[in-house]
């Protein structure tokens, strides 16, 4: 290759990066590149032999390069990729691959640094995933090694053991998430040009082309038919809340109109004739009139009344008059109330039931037994102190019930003893007889004489069994 060809290749490699730095830029870069990194940029992982290895992550290295050189002040290019080995296991088809990558980093004035990176993988299932992993790993390694040649702030300080010893004692600052630093779709800086275009387009629009019309907005005069057609065409562009209000108001007005027609049919006919003549006059003079028409919601509108008989010289009153009379409460319908099921069955479809049969949800029924020590009108916890005196009093006044409880417990114990087995048959029999005698003794504990007789019978029975044994 001749000298001219080498210069041509060198110029192509440099690209547009052939602008010399100014004195201020050079001093800034020199001071920035000589400083060492803080603890927030240093990462650690376990290395061979159980030792800790300090390194800088690839995204932090790229962020530092953009901060020091500028986002358009440096570039990287892959110079070569060499596959060192690729072994395939014939038994399971696993791939072991290793390759080296050379990356060049060029800055604004044309200066560049190259370095080598390596990527490897063992026992990978496929060739594609093996090459993908190795090429990415080798390129990232080569990029970081090329950037560290520019100075300490781009990773060269990671090879200083004394620096790593001291920076390892420092605590990195806590990370505080700031949502204001996020790049959002509504970012003003990113949408500035689009907003300017939208403003120019909105300024050229006419009022009639607006999709939404606010209340009280003035429009040019139109004929009634055209206005109705436009409302039907633009009904889909109204907001949901506005449509809901329109439909509700129309239903109310229709109900009022029916009530008004039934109440005053003659007056409605007179008003309709005058309104028709006024609309015709407005249609004839709509092109010559300069007063704008206001679009509003479908509320009851005040209609002017003509004081003269002639239609052309009609004069309207200043006092507004509504089309319909105000609503009056219907006093004939009874108010809703609760009644019992028995009263409803006795009414047999009659709406009005007698007042005595009204349902009272707070009525205390005498058929339901309730404890006197508890207030059933409120939901409160029951205190133990209020219940214990009642239990003690009942236990003192009813000894028979206590005896019955004792007898029940004795019978349960005897049943358990009888089911033990053959070894304890004599003992279970003895226990059963003694238990019955004890129960008899307890049953007659209220009478002293009967208690003595029961005791004598018990002793005699025990003596007989002892002699037989």
Swiss-Prot record:
Record-given protein name: DNA repair and recombination protein rad22
Biased composition (Polar residues): 287-296, 431-452
A GO CC term attached to the entry: nucleus
Gene3D superfamilies membership: DNA repair protein Rad52/59/22
Domain of life according to the entry: Eukaryota
Pfam families documented for this protein: Rad52_Rad22
Protein family according to the UniProt entry: Belongs to the RAD52 family.
Residues that bear Phosphoserine: 296, 319
Name of the encoding gene: rad22
GO BP annotations listed: DNA recombinase assembly; double-strand break repair via homologous recombination; double-strand break repair via single-strand annealing; gene conversion at mating-type locus; mating type switching; mitotic recombination; mitotic recombination-dependent replication fork processing; replication fork processing
Region of interest (Disordered), ranges: 265-296, 429-469
InterPro entries in alphabetical order: DNA_recomb/repair_Rad52, Rad52_fam, Rad52_Rad59_Rad22, Rad52_Rad59_Rad22_sf
Subcellular location: Nucleus
């Amino acid at each position: 290759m001749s000298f001219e060809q080498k210069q041509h290749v060198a110029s192509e490699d440099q690209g547009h990066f052939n602008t010399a730095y100014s004195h201020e830029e050079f001093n800034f870069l020199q001071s920035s590149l000589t400083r060492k990194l803080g603890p927030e940029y240093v990462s650690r992982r376990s290395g061979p032999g159980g030792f800790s290895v300090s390194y800088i992550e690839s995204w932090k290295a790229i962020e530092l390069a953009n901060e020091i050189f500028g986002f358009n002040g440096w570039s990287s290019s892959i110079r070569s990729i060499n596959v060192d080995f690729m072994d395939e296991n014939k038994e399971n088809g696993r791939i072991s691959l290793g390759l080296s990558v050379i990356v060049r980093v060029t800055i604004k004035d044309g200066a560049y640094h190259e370095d080598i990176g390596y990527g490897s993988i063992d026992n990978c299932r496929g060739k594609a995933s093996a090459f993908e992993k190795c090429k990415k790993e080798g390129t990232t390694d080569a990029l970081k090694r090329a950037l560290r040649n520019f100075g300490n702030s781009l990773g060269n300080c990671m090879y200083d053991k004394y620096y790593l010893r001291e920076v390892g004692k420092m605590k990195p600052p806590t990370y505080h998430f700031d949502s204001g630093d996020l790049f959002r779709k509504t970012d003003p800086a990113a949408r500035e040009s689009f907003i300017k275009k939208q403003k120019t387009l909105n300024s050229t629009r006419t009022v009639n082309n607006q999709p939404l019309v606010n209340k009280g907005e003035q429009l040019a005069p139109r004929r009634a038919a055209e206005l109705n057609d436009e409302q039907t065409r633009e009904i889909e562009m109204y907001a949901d809340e506005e449509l809901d209000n329109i439909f509700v108001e129309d239903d109310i007005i229709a109900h009022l109109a029916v009530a008004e027609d039934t109440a005053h049919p003659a007056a409605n006919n007179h008003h309709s004739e005058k309104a028709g003549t006024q609309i015709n006059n407005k249609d004839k003079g709509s092109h010559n009139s300069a007063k704008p028409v206001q679009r509003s919601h479908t509320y009851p509108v005040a209609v002017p009344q003509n004081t003269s008989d002639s239609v052309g010289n009609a004069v309207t009153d200043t006092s507004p008059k509504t089309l319909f009379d105000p609503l009056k409460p219907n006093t004939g319908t009874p108010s809703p109330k609760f009644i019992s099921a028995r009263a409803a069955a006795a009414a047999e479809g009659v709406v009005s039931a007698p007042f005595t049969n009204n349902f009272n949800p707070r009525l205390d029924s005498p058929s339901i037994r309730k404890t006197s020590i508890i207030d059933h009108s409120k939901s409160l916890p029951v205190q133990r102190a209020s219940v214990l005196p009642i239990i003690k009093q009942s236990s003192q006044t009813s000894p028979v019930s206590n005896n019955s409880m004792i007898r029940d417990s004795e019978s349960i114990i005897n049943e358990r003893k009888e089911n033990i087995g053959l070894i304890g048959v004599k003992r279970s029999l003895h226990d059963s007889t003694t238990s019955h005698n004890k129960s008899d003794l307890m049953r007659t504990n209220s009478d002293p004489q009967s208690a003595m007789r029961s005791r004598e019978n018990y002793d005699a029975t025990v003596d007989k069994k002892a002699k037989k044994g």
